Amino acid sequence: MIPIQLTVFFMIIYVLESLTIIVQSSLIVAVLGREWLQVRRLMPVDMILISLGISRFCLQWASMLNNFCSYFNLNYVLCNLTITWEFFNILTFWLNSLLTVFYCIKVSSFTHHIFLWLRWRILRLFPWILLGSLMITCVTIIPSAIGNYIQIQLLTMEHLPRNSTVTDKLENFHQYQFQAHTVALVIPFILFLASTIFLMASLTKQIQHHSTGHCNPSMKARFTALRSLAVLFIVFTSYFLTILITIIGTLFDKRCWLWVWEAFVYAFILMHSTSLMLSSPTLKRILKGKC
């Protein structure tokens, strides 16, 4: 059990982190959305960032409401909020992976004909790929939606005698639900890892190939990109591991350590959100023009 003062302190830290992420997400959507209305077209990276901004905005509000309902034992509200959090969490993972795939396809120097064909196809079909990630998220969330419906039904029958056979079947289903959610996060994370490794290998190869021109702007840009990619890799991997531990939910006493853990998790998410803001040339150009 931790002191109430520490609980309040970490609760405030978590709320401040959440509000910062919400403001960042709103800024990304507002700035890039305005640019879209003006020029009537967006680069694929900006399409992903707008989608990520909307997804993360909804995810953060769902997270805040979900955590407060969990802390104050508002079970009926919690069941509906959990499915919302899971949906936007899985969608955010897919969009982050697509962003890395885009950079890998766009920046990598591999010249294999399959890679070149993939580059041509992916860049042409990017809006459909975004729609596909939304559809995949909708499909993977179905077990969680069924599980939440069952949980709501159980809450309405708390006063009735329990059937042990039915209870066992429901526990087995919840195990399957957990496995489905884990797989839904692991697949885009593996995609992120593969794309990041390919991209880092390509940038390292380019740096070694042009090692004589160490001070030219092109080399500096490659070094900066490689350093940024390494930071993104560490932050996103930490984000994935903390979310996975959160889903497992057996490491900590929820009531006791909830706000400490959430403040820790969302510190990584805040760093990741900030790094994404700095990854858009359009966003940086517009914000510099406003300053």
Swiss-Prot record:
Extracellular compartment segments: 1, 63-84, 147-182, 250-257
Gene Ontology molecular function: bitter taste receptor activity; G protein-coupled receptor activity
Membrane topology classification: Multi-pass membrane protein
Organ and tissue specificity: Expressed in a subset of gustducin-positive taste receptor cells of the tongue. Expressed in circumvallate papillae and testis.
Coiled-coil intervals: none
Xref: SUPFAM superfamilies: Family A G protein-coupled receptor-like (SSF81321)
Known glycosylation sites: N80, N163
Residue spans crossing the bilayer: 2-22, 42-62, 85-105, 126-146, 183-203, 229-249, 258-278
Xref: Pfam families: TAS2R
GO cellular component: a single term: external side of plasma membrane
Localization per Swiss-Prot or TrEMBL: Cell membrane
Keywords on record: Cell membrane, G-protein coupled receptor, Glycoprotein, Membrane, Receptor, Sensory transduction, Taste, Transducer, Transmembrane, Transmembrane helix
Residue intervals annotated with topology Cytoplasmic: 23-41, 106-125, 204-228, 279-291
GO biological process per UniProt: detection of chemical stimulus involved in sensory perception of bitter taste; G protein-coupled receptor signaling pathway
InterPro entries (alphabetical): TAS2R
CDD domains per record: 7tm_TAS2R16
Role, per record: Gustducin-coupled receptor implicated in the perception of bitter compounds in the oral cavity and the gastrointestinal tract. Signals through PLCB2 and the calcium-regulated cation channel TRPM5.
Additional free-text comment from the UniProt record: Several bitter taste receptors are expressed in a single taste receptor cell.
Family: Belongs to the G-protein coupled receptor T2R family.
Subunit structure: Interacts with RTP3 and RTP4.
Entry protein name: Taste receptor type 2 member 16
Source organism (scientific name): Homo sapiens
Upper classification of the organism: Eukaryota, Metazoa, Chordata, Craniata, Vertebrata
UniProt gene name: TAS2R16
